[in-house]
Every structure is written in structure tokens, then in C-alpha cells.
């Protein structure tokens, strides 16, 4: 199984377009310790030829250009991307669908709830129904979006997208609006979970023994954005678990047998983005890799 992390940042990327927090300021200045990162997306293939895109980042055209595996290869129009799968309806995961409208056939997969959030917004009708097939997938149903690639969706604690929030919103609920993905090919297993509000015992049992876990690394501490002075929301309020602490992701998975442990969907205020920082050293010392754009895994 071949995995390419196309975009390793959370919504807005690094640096964010209007941000001068300490981390974005380093990126704007060209400091090599802070790599520029695009918004959350990965691609997975069983053979290096046919690819499944997981989440369609607003930066998808840039990501395709930066990764030769994603380039058109034959004829006047072609794409190695045969299918797209959404893990939630967040803007940084669906806006890129608007770029994928140029008459290229593929199938769009998501749970009924996630797909409804797309279908209810007429702007996505630019993906012509006779070109882009939309396929609903039930939780815990195994399907094959690309030949040789088996995928199963499962609920994880999360919340509805910001643009769908209302008075009834519940943070940490396990519904079909935020899902994790188990991907299998050639006897290897990859768990992809870019958004998760907390780690449950059921989640730990589900991912135990995977060859690689790509997991929500949005915030190091729950109050990252508040500390940086750029916002008032905690990680929890945004539906994202913190990395550090007794209930954080690293501690929660410490007793779980895993292969590669990779942090993805990293917010611009997260100090692990600074390569020589004590925060980066701390997560690496505990066995985790901080993802960057273009990182590849061959499982």
C-alpha cells in the first residue's frame, strides 16, 4: 500500500493567509524550521497507479502539482485519482471538490450524513451527476473504492462542521458526521483519523495492530489558539483532542500496539511545527512523527 500525505495542516494551512502568530511569522520569513503546509488530504493506492483521495482540500490543485503520482498521464484528460472519500463535511475537506469539476469521472464516497451536507449545497452541482457518481457508505460496511483497496468507515467522537452548527450541536458525539477510515491492501492496514475529539476504548481496540495510524494532531494543548492570542476556541470546542496530557492522544495510545504513529491535520498555532522546538522533540521522543506535505509511507 502506497500513502502520500498531500496536505498535513488543519484548516487554513501554514502559514494562514492573514496570520502573524509566532509560528506563521517564522513561515512568512522563510525560516527553514517551519515548513509551509497545505490543508488536510492524503492519497492511498494499492499499486501506485490508481489512487483514492481522502478529503478534497481547498489546496488540491497545488497538491496534485506538487506530487507527480497525481499528475495526468495519458490522453487529453486523465487523472490517477479514481475515487474520493470524505471523513467529514469540514470546509477544508470538501472545498476542493469544486476544483475537481473539469469533466473527469470519479466516484465520491461518504456516509449518508456527510454526503447530504454536500448534496444540500447547490454549489457542488458543478460536479455533474453524469460524470461524478455519489455513493453513500454505511458505517462498518467494507467497500472497495479502488480495486485492491478495502475500506471501512467507523464513527469517532467529533462534531458537525462549523458551517452546520446550531443550538443542538453536541461535541464528542459518535455519529456518521465524523468518521475514521480503516484501509487494507496487501495484508497491511492503515487507520486514517484526521478529526477526533477523544480516544475511546472502542477506538483503541479498533486500531490496535495497524501498520500505520495517521491521527488528529490539531492542537498540542487544548488552549493552543488562546495561548497564541489568535482565537478563543479550545481544541475540544473545535472537535479535536489535544496531543499532550493524561487524556491526550499520545497518552491514550501509549498502551496500544501500533506501527507508524503519525500526527496530521496540524493547526498553525501548534508548536510542534517548529522543527527544533522542545515540543517537537517531545512528541518524537514518544514515538510519533510530525507529518509534512509530501511525506510518503510504503506499507
From Swiss-Prot:
GO process annotations (BP): pyrroloquinoline quinone biosynthetic process
Pathway listed: Cofactor biosynthesis; pyrroloquinoline quinone biosynthesis
InterPro entries: Metallo-B-lactamas, PQQ_synth_PqqB, RibonucZ/Hydroxyglut_hydro
Pfam families on file: Lactamase_B_2 (PF12706)
CDD domains found in the cross-reference section: PQQB-like_MBL-fold (cd16274)
Keywords: PQQ biosynthesis, Transport
Record bears the keyword Transport: yes
Keyword RNA-binding annotated: no
Family: Belongs to the PqqB family.
Function: May be involved in the transport of PQQ or its precursor to the periplasm.
Name this protein carries in UniProt: Coenzyme PQQ synthesis protein B
Organismal lineage: Bacteria, Pseudomonadati, Pseudomonadota, Alphaproteobacteria, Hyphomicrobiales
Amino acid at each position: 500500500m502506497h500513502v502520500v500525505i498531500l496536505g498535513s495542516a488543519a484548516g487554513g494551512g501554514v502559514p494562514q493567509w492573514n496570520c502573524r502568530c509566532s509560528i506563521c511569522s517564522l513561515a512568512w520569513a522563510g525560516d527553514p524550521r517551519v515548513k509551509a503546509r497545505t490543508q488536510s488530504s492524503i492519497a492511498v493506492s494499492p499499486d501506485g497507479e490508481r489512487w483514492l483521495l481522502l478529503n478534497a482540500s481547498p489546496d488540491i490543485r497545488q497538491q496534485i502539482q506538487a506530487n507527480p503520482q497525481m499528475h495526468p498521464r495519458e490522453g487529453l484528460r486523465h487523472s490517477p485519482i479514481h475515487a474520493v472519500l470524505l471523513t467529514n463535511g469540514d470546509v477544508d475537506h470538501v472545498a476542493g471538490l469544486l476544483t475537481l469539476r473539469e469533466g473527469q469521472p470519479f466516484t465520491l464516497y461518504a456516509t449518508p450524513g456527510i454526503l447530504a451536507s454536500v448534496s444540500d449545497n447547490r454549489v457542488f452541482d458543478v460536479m455533474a451527476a453524469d460524470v461524478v457518481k455519489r455513493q453513500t457508505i454505511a458505517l462498518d460496511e467494507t467497500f472497495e473504492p479502488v480495486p485492491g483497496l478495502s475500506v471501512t468507515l467507523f464513527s469517532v467522537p467529533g462534531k458537525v462542521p462549523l458551517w452546520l452548527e446550531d443550538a443542538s450541536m453536541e461535541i464528542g458525539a459518535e455519529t456518521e458526521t465524523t468518521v475514521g477510515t480503516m484501509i487494507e491492501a496487501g495484508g497491511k492496514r492503515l487507520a486514517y483519523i484526521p478529526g477526533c475529539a477523544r480516544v475511546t476504548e472502542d477506538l483503541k481496540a479498533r486500531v490496535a495492530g495497524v501498520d500505520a495510524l495517521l491521527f488528529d494532531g490539531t492542537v498540542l494543548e487544548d488552549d493552543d489558539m488562546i495561548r497564541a492570542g489568535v482565537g478563543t476556541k479550545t481544541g475540544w470546542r473545535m472537535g479535536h483532542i489535544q496531543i499532550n496530557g493524561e487524556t491526550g492522544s499520545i497518552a491514550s495510545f501509549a498502551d496500544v500496539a501500533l506501527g507508524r504513529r503519525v500526527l496530521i491535520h496540524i493547526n498553525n498555532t501548534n508548536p510542534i511545527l517548529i522543527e527544533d522546538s522542545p515540543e517537537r522533540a517531545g512528541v518524537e521522543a514518544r514515538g510519533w512523527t510530525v507529518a509534512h506535505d509530501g511525506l510518503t509511507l510504503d506499507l
